[in-house]
């Protein structure tokens, strides 16, 4: 038993030692770095300026793709390093620096030439500033041509020097030693540079400089003909003063606003005056207000549903019109039995053509729907017409029973039938 126990212990020890040796061999084996994105190993992806070139025609479009897109430089590090290092901004800066007396000022001394002559143009100075300051110093006017001397480290230095911004900010004075020296005679700008000078992050495009209004730039040095400027307009994220004309627009609209209601109030009283004139006229006047009826249809549409005609006359005309129709409605007993109180002005219109008793029932049937559809405008002049023919109202009661036999008989026939029913009922009772 002891021998078996010792054999097991030895086997376990051997297994443990072999496992440790395997782990050591794995740790010593070299690991190949896996670059998922450019941000993971940004320092390892930097390429020296001598070999930093674009080898593909589609690199410009490839470098402008957004960072979140799967086809961007960040998500395709192999293509960015091998084919498009310039457009993806992977070029390394290796220049000779000499510190001046001020610890925060760095003066770059290098040969002022264009290393990549084919790719250097005015647009590159602003679209890819890091690469342009190393490979396109002459095109971007960052130093004196063909001489080793101080060089600017920002492509906007020529613009800042021409307009006198060198002494307005320490960043401009420190990063633009050449152009600030060339344009030292230019007076200081009245205001500091309005746009942001330093980018918020490494891949943020620089805002294109725009000349201030009313300021002329200084003349260029004799060895430069044209200043580097982009061929397209500046970015829209820095708009001009568009808020100035905005307050003037509401002021112009506010002025005609009060005039509009005044213009509508003027023709309002003129309309009832025109209707008051044809009211006392012959039945020809009924044909004249026919076109005016559709205009009033919009107002009296809710009137028959609301039943009372007095609330309609109260808000539209003056308060004097409210008591006028009240006495006319009281003596008319037929108005209560009639379907609507609007029938009150109907007998007044019929009182004028008294001799024409024969066509009276036809006229009563025709204007009945018209009076219901447009009573609002005719109700206003009703009291005025009644006040004028006051003496003629005396013969009116004689014509009333002759002209209105039909409506009167219909109203009286109902109680007469009821009496007959009672008699018949009483007669039946007697027979029983």
Swiss-Prot record:
Residues 235-432 are annotated as: Disordered. The keyword Cell membrane does not apply. Residues 409-432 have a biased composition (Basic residues). InterPro entries: ShKT_dom. Residues 235-313, 331-408 have a biased composition (Low complexity). Nematocytes. In late planulae, transcripts are found throughout the ectoderm in nematocytes, with high concentration of expressing cells in the oral pole. In primary polyps, is expressed in nematocytes in the body wall and physa ectoderm and in the upper and lower pharynx. Residues 59-91, 107-143, 149-183 form the ShKT domain. Residues 314-330 have a biased composition (Pro residues). Keywords: Disulfide bond, Nematocyst, Secreted, Signal, Toxin. It comes from the Eukaryota. One of its GO terms (molecular function) is toxin activity. Residues 1-19 form the signal peptide. It is found in: Nematocyst; Secreted. Disulfide bonds join 52-91, 59-84, 73-88, 125-140, 157-176, 166-180. Belongs to the NEP3 family. Probable toxin. This is Nematocyst expressed protein 3-like.
């Amino acid at each position: 038993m002891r021998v078996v126990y010792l054999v097991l212990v030895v086997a376990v020890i051997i297994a443990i030692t072999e496992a440790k040796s395997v782990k050591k061999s794995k740790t010593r084996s070299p690991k190949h770095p896996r670059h998922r994105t450019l941000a993971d190993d940004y320092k390892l992806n930097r390429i020296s300026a001598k070999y930093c070139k674009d080898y593909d025609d589609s690199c410009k479009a490839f470098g402008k793709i957004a960072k979140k897109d799967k086809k961007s430089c960040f998500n395709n590090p192999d293509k960015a390093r091998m084919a498009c290092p310039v457009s993806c901004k992977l070029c390394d800066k290796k220049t000779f620096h000499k510190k001046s007396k001020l610890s925060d000022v760095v003066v770059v001394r290098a040969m002022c030439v264009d290393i990549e002559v084919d790719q250097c143009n005015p647009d590159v100075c602003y679209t890819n500033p890091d690469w342009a300051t190393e490979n396109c110093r002459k095109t971007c006017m960052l130093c004196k041509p063909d001489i080793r001397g101080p060089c600017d480290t920002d492509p906007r230095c020529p613009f800042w020097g021409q307009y006198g911004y060198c002494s307005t900010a320490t960043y401009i004075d420190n990063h633009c030693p050449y152009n600030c020296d060339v344009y030292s005679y230019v007076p200081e700008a009245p205001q500091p540079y309005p746009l942001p000078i330093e980018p918020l992050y490494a891949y943020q495009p620089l805002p294109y400089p725009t000349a201030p209004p009313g300021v002329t730039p200084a003349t260029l040095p004799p060895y430069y003909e044209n200043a580097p400027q982009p061929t397209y307009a500046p970015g829209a994220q820095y708009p001009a003063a568009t808020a100035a004309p905005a307050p003037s627009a509401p002021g112009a609209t506010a002025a005609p606003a009060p005039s509009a209601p005044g213009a509508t109030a003027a023709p309002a009283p003129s309309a009832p005056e025109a209707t008051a004139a044809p009211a006392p006229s012959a039945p020809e006047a009924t044909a004249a207000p026919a076109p005016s009826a559709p205009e009033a249809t919009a107002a009296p549409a809710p009137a028959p549903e609301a039943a009372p005609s007095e609330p309609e006359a109260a808000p539209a005309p003056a308060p004097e019109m409210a008591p006028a129709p009240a006495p006319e409605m009281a003596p008319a007993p037929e108005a209560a039995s009639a379907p609507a109180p609007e029938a009150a002005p109907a007998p007044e219109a019929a009182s004028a053509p008294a001799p024409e008793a024969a066509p009276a029932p036809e006229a009563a049937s025709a204007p009945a729907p018209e009076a219901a559809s447009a009573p609002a405008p005719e109700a206003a002049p009703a009291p005025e017409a009644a006040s004028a023919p006051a003496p003629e109202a005396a013969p009116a009661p004689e014509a009333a029973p002759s002209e209105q036999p039909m409506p009167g008989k219909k109203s009286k026939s109902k109680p007469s039938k009821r009496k007959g029913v009672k008699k018949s009922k009483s007669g039946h009772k007697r027979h029983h």
